[in-house]
């Protein structure tokens, strides 16, 4: 259980509740969650964040009607800046997108502008939206996270309760610059406790991080209840606090749910996240 899973900011969410699906446009379906909800306990404040970054969403189930009533389909790419006051709750995002299904729009640009306006209002930040026709994406290869995978270690684990203490004393010795990857990240939805599966890329420069300790730390998220974005910020904050690298970037790509995948990244250096879906996305 997290320290804030009964917080009043979560009380009005449709997540975890029986919901009617609407197929005509309704921007009021979108619901935001204050980023401060998990940042305050971590000692992170909007005016002095130790990182920059964004939440990258892929919208796989996006459809509307053109001016003549002919259905249109697209794949959407959305970026919410880490500086927005709110993150967008994913079930509300899905319900909102469903409301486009039987709504007529004059053009693709109108759809993109509507998404940009509504998501920016919900997040209280400047959101970027791009729409892609299917033939623009056909033949696109499966992407991979660059780096050394740390998953094949011959270690025994019997504790799956979250603990940042696994990182205590994890960094020592000479300064290195490396990128590590794990596909074993699994956390749970803050409200429903349904599993969230992800791959995480950690790029840093600093004292070498012990890979066994890092893997034990990542595996300890297995019973942890937080939203995707919150988990990435926690990982960044914990590594920065315990390992004190000169530079650090954390990027996670989660499997899709409800036609959406969420891919947050946070960095205090020069980092450009690779886009493109992974094998499990």
Swiss-Prot record:
Catalysed reactions listed for this entry: 7-aminomethyl-7-carbaguanine + 2 NADP(+) = 7-cyano-7-deazaguanine + 2 NADPH + 3 H(+)
The enzyme's E.C. designation: 1.7.1.13
Disulfide bonds: none
A GO BP annotation: tRNA modification
Pfam family for this entry, one: QueF_N
Active-site residues per Swiss-Prot or TrEMBL entry: 189 (thioimide intermediate), 196 (proton donor)
Source taxon at top rank: Bacteria
HAMAP family: QueF_type2
Function recorded in the entry: Catalyzes the NADPH-dependent reduction of 7-cyano-7-deazaguanine (preQ0) to 7-aminomethyl-7-deazaguanine (preQ1).
Protein name: NADPH-dependent 7-cyano-7-deazaguanine reductase
Organism the protein comes from: Klebsiella pneumoniae subsp. pneumoniae (strain ATCC 700721 / MGH 78578)
Designated gene of the protein: queF
């Amino acid at each position: 259980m997290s320290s804030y899973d009964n917080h009043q900011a979560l009380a009005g969410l449709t997540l975890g509740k029986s919901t009617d699906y609407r197929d005509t446009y309704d921007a009021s379906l979108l619901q935001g969650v204050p980023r401060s909800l998990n940042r305050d306990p971590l000692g992170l404040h909007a005016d002095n964040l130790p990182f920059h970054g964004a939440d990258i969403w892929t919208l796989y189930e996006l459809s509307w009607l053109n001016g003549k009533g002919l259905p249109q389909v697209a794949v959407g790419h959305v970026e919410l800046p880490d500086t927005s006051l709110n993150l967008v709750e994913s079930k509300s995002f899905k319900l909102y997108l469903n409301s486009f299904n039987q709504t007529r729009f004059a053009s693709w640009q109108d759809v993109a502008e509507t998404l940009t306006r509504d998501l920016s209002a919900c997040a209280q930040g400047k959101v970027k939206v791009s729409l892609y026709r299917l033939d623009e994406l056909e033949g696109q290869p499966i992407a991979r996270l660059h780096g050394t995978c740390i998953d094949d270690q011959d270690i025994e684990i019997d504790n799956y309760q979250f603990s940042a203490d696994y990182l205590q004393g994890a960094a020592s010795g000479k300064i290195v610059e490396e990128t590590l990857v794990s596909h074993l990240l699994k956390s749970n939805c803050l409200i429903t406790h349904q599993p969230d599966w992800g791959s995480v890329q950690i790029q840093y420069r600093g004292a070498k991080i012990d890979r066994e300790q890092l893997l034990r730390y990542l595996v300890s998220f297995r019973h942890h209840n937080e939203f995707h974005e919150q988990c990435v910020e926690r990982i960044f904050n914990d590594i920065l606090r315990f390992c004190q690298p000169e530079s650090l970037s954390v990027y996670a790509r989660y499997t899709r749910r409800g036609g959406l995948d969420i891919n947050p990244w946070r960095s205090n250096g020069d980092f450009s996240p690779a886009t493109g879906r992974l094998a499990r996305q």
